[in-house]
Structure formats: structure tokens, C-alpha cells
Amino acid sequence: MEKNPEIQFRSPEEIKCYQEGQLAKTLTYLQAHSKFYQRMFEEHHIDINQIKKIEDLQQIPVTTKTDLQLHNDDFICVDKEQIIDYVTTSGTLGDPVTFVLTSEDLDRLSYNEYLSFTTTGCSKKDILQLMTTIDRRFMAGLAYYMGARELGMGVIRVGNGIPELQWDTIRRIHPTCGMVVPSFLIKLIEFAEKNHIDHNACSMQKCICIGEALRNQEFQLNTLGQKIHDKWPALQLYSTYASTEMQSSFTECSEFHGGHLQPELIIVEFLDDNNRPVAEGEAGEVTITTLGVEGMPLLRFKTGDICYHHTEPCACGRNTIRLSSILGRKGQMIKYKGTT
């Protein structure tokens, strides 16, 4: 894949034009290599040469988690000899779905988190304490480890759990940044308080948080985020949103007004129950098309996650789409007096 980190600071029109160029490459690749999408294009009489604009994606059916579950192997676009890494994610029908990554896909994954780190203001002067696993077929820990290497940060692979080991590492090596599931920070705070550790005076300045929301739809800290902030006000908390399927992430900048799209890596749509785009200010299902993926690219994949989106320029200088915190999963939302 080609790297273009400056594209996020271009005008919305330039970003859209760039993405449409990458979309054409993705469609050509899918038609040549994906059994699933070859079948879809044939059954629905889709001429990929007519898909020129992001709006034209509406001519193509969506892909669902059930499709992945039932036709897992048909999504694989490369020979087994090209597969370097295997990861899994939960499926809708019980069994996990396997995702395969090539060497190029791992480079893309590394670049994804390089962008995430730079979005939060990290640099090669920082030291990262990795507080999640990089094994057990888990993508995120490996992605952040590789992204930190690409940025040039020092990395301490502590893994998840064991507050005593986490604090011993902080005391010995003085990391400045953590990558963590935010509820674990509560356990770190509790351990520090019981053992007379002044956590607000330690070296840790910020944490990039995965797996759990920290803010509400107004970008204010939610109950979990506020609980951490009240006890550890010196620590900056950055929310993220990601999934194995997209092999990418949305990350907050220092304005804390939503997670930024990485336009080199995915196209995102927000769809209603009829798979039509929702207007800004309306909740929609996050639907993604991967760009630059070799092993298992996805086209109009519905994640099941419902959120709001924002398109106005961010004060950080980026002009990318931003996501709110996830409202919930499709099928778990309820209606009350016309409001989701």
C-alpha cells in the first residue's frame, strides 16, 4: 500500500478524491481474487467500472458478519504460502471467524497504529508500556507493538493483568504512554492506593485505550472515564474504535472530539436499517470498505456498531470524518418515543 499521512490534513474534497482512486484499485483486486465478491458481482450484475464515486457504493449489497461466518474461506484472496499471520474474531453463529494477513497486511497494520500514535501526539521520544496480550490470536496488541516500532518508540511488553508487575515496570523504566483496556486502569489505581504509590507523580502521561468507551455522545467523559480521571487527573485518556474486520482504527486527537478516520486505510459509511446513508446528526451503523488489504479485504462490511459521525474540520487540523462513541450494537438498540 502507498503511505500518504498528509492526506488527513487535506480538504474533504481532496480526501474523497484520493479514496475514490483507492476504491477503484480495491474493486479490481476483489474481482480478480475474491471468490465471494466475484459471485456477488455476477449475481447482482455489478459492473465495477461503473463504481466511480463513494456514493456509487450504494449499488453494491452490504457484507454481513453472517456472510463471513458462512463463507469464511471464500473471502481469502491469497495462496496459503502468502499468509503470514492468522487472527480470529467472534462470529454471529458461534464459531470464530478466521482472518489472514500477508506480509503487506502486517505492514499496513503497523502503519495504522503509527498513525494512531501520531494522532495522540506520541513521538519516538516516548516509551510505550503495552498492557494487553500480543498472543491468543489477538490483533490489537500486535498492531500497537508494530506501530510503536514504526514510530521508533521504546516498547515494554508487559501484557495484561498483574498490577504489581505493571507498577514495577513503571518504577524501573519510566514509560510515558500506556496501551490498555481502560477498566484495568481502575485496578492499577486501586493497587497504587493500597501500596502507597503516588500514581499522579509517575512517568505515565497518557494512555491509548481500547475495547471500552470513555466518552459520551457529547464527547464528555462517561462514568468509566470520569472515575479514572477523578483518581488520576494527570493521565490523559485517548479513546479508540477498531475491529479485526477493518484492520484499522479510529483514534482521538488532543481535542477529544471523536475518533479520526484514517482515509488511506478504509472508507466508512453510516447506514440505516435499509442500508441507506444517514444524515449527519442521525445514528447509523458503521459500514467499512478496506483499502490496501491483500489477505481478506472487505467491501461494505456492516460492523453492527451504531454511532454518530461528524464531518466539520477538527481544531487539530485534520479534515477526516470523526466517530462518536459507540451507542450500542445493532439488535440491542431500543426505541422510546421515536428515539433510538
Task: Indicate residue ranges for each PLM-predicted region.
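Secondary-structure boundary/capping residues
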Residues: 39, 98, 122-125, 137, ...
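Short aromatic/hydrophobic contact patches that present stacked aromatics
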Residues: 98, 129, 333-335
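Glycine-rich, often proline-containing surface loops adjacent to acidic residues and nearby aromatics
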Residues: 92, 127, 205
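Beta-strand-connecting loops/turns
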Residues: 125-126, 281
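Hydrophobic alpha-helical segments that mediate membrane insertion or helix-helix packing
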Residues: 89-90, 128, 148, 268
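Nucleotide 5′-phosphate-binding alpha/beta core
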Residues: 1-88, 94-111, 115-119, 124, ...
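AMP-binding/adenylate-forming
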Residues: 103-118, 127-187
